[in-house]
């Protein structure tokens, strides 16, 4: 079973950019209600896709330096990375089915 990694400005490069496979990053904040709705969906995805992707969450208030690099303007923002490349982006709360479709379209 895969758990969600807590990402920080300090560990982002090691955990995401240097990772050899796909990493789904959720940019979020504690005050964001759509982020709270998305949280349990991400937990399920982390378990169901444990052999395909790594899932991480980056709190943009506690870690203010990383989000501007990727032009994060709205949250929740989901970015799918492969190495240093952003393959796809999805902004806003989405259903589990929409998230699975997003991943299946981009993980090949």
From Swiss-Prot:
Cystine bridges: 32-35
Protein name: Thioredoxin
Record organism: Buchnera aphidicola subsp. Schizaphis graminum (strain Sg)
GO biological processes: cell redox homeostasis
Entries under SUPFAM superfamilies matching the protein: Thioredoxin-like
Gene3D superfamilies: Glutaredoxin (3.40.30.10)
Residues spanning the signal sequence: none
InterPro entries hit by this protein: Thioredoxin, Thioredoxin-like_sf, Thioredoxin_domain
GO molecular function, one term: protein-disulfide reductase activity
Keyword tRNA processing belongs to the record: no
Family: Belongs to the thioredoxin family.
Gene this chain is encoded by: trxA
GO CC list: cytosol
Entry annotated with the keyword Transferase: no
General function of this protein: Participates in various redox reactions through the reversible oxidation of its active center dithiol to a disulfide and catalyzes dithiol-disulfide exchange reactions.
Keywords, comma-separated and alphabetical: Disulfide bond, Electron transport, Redox-active center, Transport
Domain Thioredoxin positions: 2-108
């Amino acid at each position: 079973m895969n758990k969600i990694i807590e990402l920080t400005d300090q560990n982002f490069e090691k955990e995401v950019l240097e990772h050899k496979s796909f990493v789904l990053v959720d940019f979020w904040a504690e005050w964001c209600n759509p982020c709270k709705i998305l949280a349990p969906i991400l937990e399920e995805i982390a378990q169901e896709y444990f052999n395909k992707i790594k899932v991480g969450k980056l709190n943009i208030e506690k870690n203010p330096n990383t989000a501007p690099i990727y032009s994060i303007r709205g949250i929740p923002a989901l970015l799918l990375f492969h190495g240093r490349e952003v393959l796809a982006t999805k902004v806003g709360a989405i259903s589990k089915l929409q998230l699975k479709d997003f991943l299946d379209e981009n993980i090949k």
